[in-house]
């Protein structure tokens, strides 16, 4: 990155950091983004250059930033002695821990995402893909898609649980995630005949149902 690119990136991070605070006061909208720029002593013109697509681009920048932090933290705890099941669990927990300090703002972001299912699925798929790859998955066949769809369901349903979790250290969420992963492992043990009846389409429908629940959350 050259000097100008570093400056550009620094300003984008500054806006994002401020926006995660301002979302709690103004909601997730254009006015909030403008207010965040003002709070960072930046003009609306500069804001337009930093995030030309407004809120949508801010959200994408947020998800990309979280992805980088998640992979960095996963790599810190990587061990060949950990089961794949536990690597998946750790990946989801690490991501939720990154969300913790901005929990209410994160809720706003995901409720907003639920209104645009296609974009939401794209982000869910990317998260699941990164977690699977970090766990050592190199599958390229039909299982490649099923694994990512199932993890998207596990992650999104766990996120919904986490939003309502008031227990210390999110213990309720951790128990919920363990149960969800166990359900997926049970699915993996079923015969190919049974699996064929539980298609990727049915998993996709489960995701749609959770997105509808997210959309109805009051923020």
PLM features per residue range, with description:
Residues 45:
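Key DNA-contact positions within bacterial/archaeal DNA-binding proteins
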Residues 96-118, 125:
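Amphipathic alpha-helical segments used for helix-helix packing
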Residues 190-219:
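Long, charge-rich low-complexity segments
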Residues 115-137, 146-152, 156:
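Amphipathic alpha-helical packing segments from all-alpha helical-bundle domains
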């Amino acid at each position: 990155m050259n000097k100008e690119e570093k400056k550009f990136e620094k300003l984008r991070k500054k806006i994002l950091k401020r926006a995660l605070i301002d979302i709690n006061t103004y909601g997730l909208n254009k006015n909030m983004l403008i207010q965040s720029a003002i709070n960072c002593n930046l003009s609306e013109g500069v804001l337009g250059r930093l995030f030309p697509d407004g809120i949508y681009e801010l959200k994408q920048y947020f998800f990309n930033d979280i992805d980088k932090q998640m992979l960095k933290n996963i790599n810190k705890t990587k061990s060949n002695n950990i089961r794949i099941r536990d690597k998946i669990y750790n990946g989801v927990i690490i991501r939720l821990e990154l969300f913790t300090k901005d929990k209410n703002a994160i809720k706003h972001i995901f409720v907003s995402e639920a209104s645009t299912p296609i974009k939401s699925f794209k982000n869910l798929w990317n998260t699941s893909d990164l977690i699977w790859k970090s766990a050592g998955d190199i599958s390229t066949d039909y299982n490649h898609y099923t694994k990512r769809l199932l993890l998207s369901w596990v992650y999104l349903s766990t996120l919904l649980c986490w939003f309502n979790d008031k227990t210390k250290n999110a213990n309720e969420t951790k128990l919920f995630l363990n149960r969800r992963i166990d359900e997926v492992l049970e699915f993996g043990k079923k015969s190919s005949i049974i699996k064929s009846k539980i298609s990727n389409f049915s998993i996709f429908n489960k995701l749609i149902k959770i997105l509808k629940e997210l959309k109805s959350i009051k923020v």
